[in-house]
Amino acid sequence: MLCSCDGCALLFQDGYGRYRRIPRDAYYLADFRLDELQWEALSIPINLAFFFFSTAANCTLAFYPSAGGATESLLDLAAWNGIAAAHPRIQQMRPDVEALLVNRLANPSEYYVSPIDRCYELTGIVRKHWSGFTGGDAVWKAIAEFFTTLRNEAVKVEPRHA
């Protein structure tokens, strides 16, 4: 992210050229699900993660928030491509600026197409509030508050009906 001012947002709103505008809306994916086998195939060691297509790397990358910041997890691209192929909204994510944000701490799990800066906001929350080996009560409360806010602000994408 180079700038977040309204002027740059207007200038780069069409996504042409080198810079892209980060969208403001998050979308709750009511019909998206990952079963345990799919999640395990992605090799994410915790139950929070975000996935986005990086134009610099020319592939989808996976990160999870940690006490040390955003931590990259080596992603099995075949597993990811199989998941993405079944979900049109995931295929439509804008490179570099939108991510699939997964919250498997919630019951049931929650899935959002989120502006990338919200993913890094969550990472900052984890980094700021983490204490000790297991994180401490403050971090889990802050994570829950983050997702409550995101859930309330997100546009709900209704399930597809055949």
Go through each PLM region and give its residues:
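Selected N-terminal structured segments and early membrane-anchoring regions
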Residues: 45-52, 76-89
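Ordered, amphipathic secondary-structure segments that act as subunit-interaction surfaces
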Residues: 26-68
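Primary mode marks residue(s) on the alpha4-beta5-alpha5 output face of response regulator receiver
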Residues: 55, 65-82
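C-terminal, charged low-complexity interaction regions
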Residues: 81-162
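Generic recognition of cysteine residues
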Residues: 3-5, 59, 119
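N-terminal cysteine/histidine-rich coordination modules
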Residues: 1-28
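Residues in well-ordered beta-strands of folded domains
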Residues: 4, 20, 51-53, 62-64, ...
